[in-house]
Amino acid sequence: MLSSRLSRALPRTAPFARAPAFRLPSTAARRWNSTEEKVKGQVIGIDLGTTNSAVAVMEGKTPKIIENAEGARTTPSVVAFAQDGERLVGIAAKRQAVVNPENTLFATKRLIGRKFTDAEVQRDIKEVPYKIVQHTNGDAWVEARGEKYSPAQIGGFVLGKMKETAENYLSKPVKNAVVTVPAYFNDSQRQATKDAGQIAGLNVLRVVNEPTAAALAYGLEKEADRVVAVYDLGGGTFDISVLEIQKGVFEVKSTNGDTHLGGEDFDISLVRHIVQQFKKESGLDLSNDRMAIQRIREAAEKAKIELSSSLQTEINLPFITADASGAKHINLKMTRAQLESLVEPLISRTVDPVRKALKDANLQSSEVQDIILVGGMTRMPKVTESVKSLFGREPAKSVNPDEAVAIGAAIQGAVLAGEVTDVLLLDVTPLSLGIETLGGVFTRLINRNTTIPTKKSQTFSTAADFQTAVEIKVFQGERELVKDNKLLGNFQLVGIPPAHRGVPQIEVTFDIDADSIVHVHAKDKSTNKDQSITIASGSGLSDAEIQSMVEDAEKYGAQDKERKAAIEAANRADSVLNDTEKALKEFEDRLDKAEAEQIREKINTLREFVAKNQSGEVAATAEELKQKTDELQTASLTLFDKMHKAQSEQQQQPNQGETGQGENKP
């Protein structure tokens, strides 16, 4: 029986073979960056947020946020599936959430790259109105209208909307993008985000940490050397990064955070409070009423936003439910102090990561010169106060919390395209990486906050006599035992010559690229047999599944275009109907009755067809609507042309008679 255990290489057979960490010094990094092959075509920057997303592009040397079709600078990261099968993304999806809560998917970024059994996922199951289900590979997926979707697929739909927004603005197809992720995302979550980009039809050139992108937006025009801290409290995640900005080099010194802490948690706290208050007053429990909870959730989010600028607000939800005594309403006054008391534990959870990030950067809080606030939750006065208390100074106000990340992504895109040449980004890996060794111990090869790209090797040996194969299990995390860390992947190295334990020399090499994606290689030094793995399916999606999702996204894209064309055709039909009816009413006494009746029949036929299409009784294509509209328009124009011609001839006849009489006068 083959043993699959590894142990550290024993000194009596060979000392540890520790290759030095490959870290690019500033000058070498500059050379590496400048010789990198430049990207052809426009590169957009996308902030794929938990609550809202944004897209930006560089226009010359100036980054610009692109407004969506509704004129907004951010788009809700919400996807819904209507009863007729239509897929809605963004504002349209959010608007119908109250009447369709089970099939409206929001905050799915919190599920990306996670297993169904994760504690965070189990908590979310109790808080969202839609179904979170377990996929066959153990990943957390979501369900809507009986169909199952991966969180990466939902993210792909949102990215597709951002792509469409950019293409409408630029008036040309867009393929290349830089997409941002929370700095504390692990490898699985990063790879799932890249999968989302692929599903959207994007070539994701780089995955950039959100705080780093915000620092790029902040420091692009700054001349002086600065040490900055980026405090990023968004809709679903919290990140803190400490950077040194020096002559165009943005070097991340440390990063920390919590991938399950954000505005959604603040909303949940407020929703629970409202439900408890209503139960106390009415005796009715709304916890299992999905439509009521969705209404309360929207009201809670609105109240939270209002209390950032007001000291008091009212939550009024009429007809929230009913019992034997009649309809029940929610009328609740909420003060800023009450809200702050409710969310104080959540704000406190950001303190420890900040202190750890400062410690890892070997800095005191007083040495940080600028504090940049990113994410919508940083607008809450209590959050700002907490940041001021931590750093002993007021945060900078020059960065838009909702837009900075997308702008930074666009800047990095311009760097990759060669349009911006004086900027270099040196990011870090947020979590330690290593393998399992004898006894379930987590042996680190790369420590957290190591500058990337990086490469490191270490030699191990067998843990049992005559062991001819080993299993390399790759983990990510900060705990001492592998059971407490995240398993990224595993592979077998076979064909090791039988020998006593501790004799074989197995070199394990970790290589992390600029996207923080991990590549692991193992080699038996005596035979040079090797095996490697790229942790490239952290989302749990196979290449076939991703390709299928790409095709689904393209299918939805085609359906969206068809629906848009059908809507435009229906609007044109309404316009032609109204114009024709108006003209018929105005000139009816001058028209041939039989011909006028034919036009009226065509009007009724088209109006009935349009009404059936709107009700869903028929699913008319744009071509069918166009054909029927053209028939009415052609018939009515022919009739009205005939009427105008006859009218013109009548007007000419008397004039000709008068002229003739005048000529016959003596």
Curated annotation (Swiss-Prot):
Residues 635-666 are annotated as: Disordered. It is an enzyme of class 3 (hydrolase). Gene3D superfamilies: 1.20.1270.10, 3.30.420.40, Actin, Chain A, domain 4 (3.90.640.10), Substrate Binding Domain Of DNAk, Chain A, domain 1 (2.60.34.10). It comes from the Eukaryota. One of its GO terms (molecular function) is ATP-dependent protein folding chaperone. Residues 648-666 have a biased composition (Low complexity). Its EC number is 3.6.4.10. Keywords: ATP-binding, Coiled coil, Hydrolase, Mitochondrion, Nucleotide-binding, Stress response, Transit peptide. InterPro entries: ATPase_NBD (IPR043129), Chaperone_DnaK (IPR012725), Heat_shock_70_CS (IPR018181), HSP70_C_sf (IPR029048), HSP70_peptide-bd_sf (IPR029047), Hsp_70_fam (IPR013126). It catalyses: ATP + H2O = ADP + phosphate + H(+). PROSITE patterns: HSP70_1 (PS00297), HSP70_2 (PS00329), HSP70_3 (PS01036). Residues 1-33 form a transit peptide. Pfam families: HSP70. GO terms for biological process: cellular response to osmotic stress; chaperone cofactor-dependent protein refolding; iron-sulfur cluster assembly; protein refolding; spore germination. Induction: Up-regulated when grown with elevated levels of potassium chloride. It is found in: Mitochondrion matrix. GO terms for cellular component: cytoplasm; mitochondrial matrix; mitochondrion. Residues 566-637 form a coiled coil. Interacts with the Fe/S cluster assembly and transfer machinery. Component of the PAM complex. Belongs to the heat shock protein 70 family. PANTHER family: HEAT SHOCK PROTEIN 70KDA. Required for the assembly of iron-sulfur (Fe/S) clusters in mitochondria. Assisted by the DnaJ-like co-chaperone jac1 and the nucleotide exchange factor mge1, it mediates ATP-dependent Fe-S cluster transfer from the scaffold proteins isu1/isu2 to grx5. Essential component of the PAM complex, a complex required for the translocation of transit peptide-containing proteins from the inner membrane into the mitochondrial matrix in an ATP-dependent manner. Constitutes the ATP-driven core of the motor and binds the precursor preprotein. This is Iron-sulfur cluster biogenesis chaperone, mitochondrial. It comes from Emericella nidulans (strain FGSC A4 / ATCC 38163 / CBS 112.46 / NRRL 194 / M139).
